[in-house]
Amino acid sequence: MVNVLLAGGISMAVALLCTKPFIAFLVRRRWGQFIRDDLVHHHVKRGKPTMGGAVIIGAALVGYFASHAVVLALGATGVLKVVRSSISLGALLVLFLLTGLGVVGFLDDYTKIRKERSLGLTSRQKLLGQTLVTVVFALGALLMTDEQGLSPASTAVSFIRDTDIDLAFAGPVVAVVLFVAWSNVLIAGASNGVNITDGLDGLATGASVMVFGAYTVIATWQYNQGCGVAPGPNCYDVRDALDLAVLACAIGGACFGFLWWNASPAEIIMGDTGSLSLGAALAGLAILTHTQLLLVVLGGLFVIVTASVIIQVISFKLTGKRVFRIAPLHHHFEMVGWSEVTIVARFWIIAGICITAGLALFYAEWLTRG
């Protein structure tokens, strides 16, 4: 689709061109990253410009809205016949997640800079911010319907499609409460997963490019095989699928452009401004494309890295011994002696395998229904 590619191309160009001036701005203000004392390999990165996620968010917003404007102009002039998707509620809700968690991440990054420490907001403050943003998203996704009475989200727990597990088993009120709680689990888990993975130059950014690329493919496929376009036993009843593909490509393109400056040796770090917002956007896309649990496969790298932290904490509390030299997992391999570039490359390979497996499951499920 022209608008999908436009969104990705515009956002990539904006991120590529605007990150360097943003780095200069941060350097002038001396807004740099503080590093944990036990990460001896990273002391050289102390003071490196952070909050790069602001560029990703800004570029994604520009790419998304500019692509709609360009496609609208092309359609009006008749220069090019395109399938145009209007700005949708679903995409706006994901953008709300992106910017809302971006604000939470910005406050965390700014607190680190102002107090000159590696820890920003407290866990309780972060959780409160994530919860407030999630509640607004979840209520909008579930309760705001279109002319056909279809809401962007469903009360059913989904894997590749909605499953038989329906949160509305005890009535509509309980369904709303459970959906908000379930959304909070997904969004908090995804945002913190990306946040934990963002420990090496380019690692989380490159992995995010792949996952957003996967959701671009998934949402585009859902549109092309939608029940309103291609009725059949394997069609998808997903609202705003094409526009979600536009947005996924815009965010992925923004990450791709930012990666030019974030790859080793990074000139800027995305910070919590980027990691929390990107994880939340991924969870939002998973919820609205009805592929909630498939995100566990697609974002398998984030799951593995997060699991390493959980395993380390549980092991130390129960036995007093550590499974890894240090957690998260990528820092363990640094302590073992792997170079940063080697770790990132190999973890990207793992991310690619997870993406391939997730897309294969998605396509295989469609084939079995045909």
Predicted feature locations:
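Alpha-helical transmembrane segments
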Residues: 1-29, 58-106, 110, 134-162, ...
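Juxtamembrane helix-capping/reentrant segments at transmembrane boundaries
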Residues: 36-49, 116-129, 335
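Juxtamembrane linker/hinge segments adjacent to transmembrane helices in membrane proteins
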Residues: 22-44
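Membrane interface segments of multi-pass transport proteins and intramembrane proteases
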Residues: 112-122, 159-167, 339
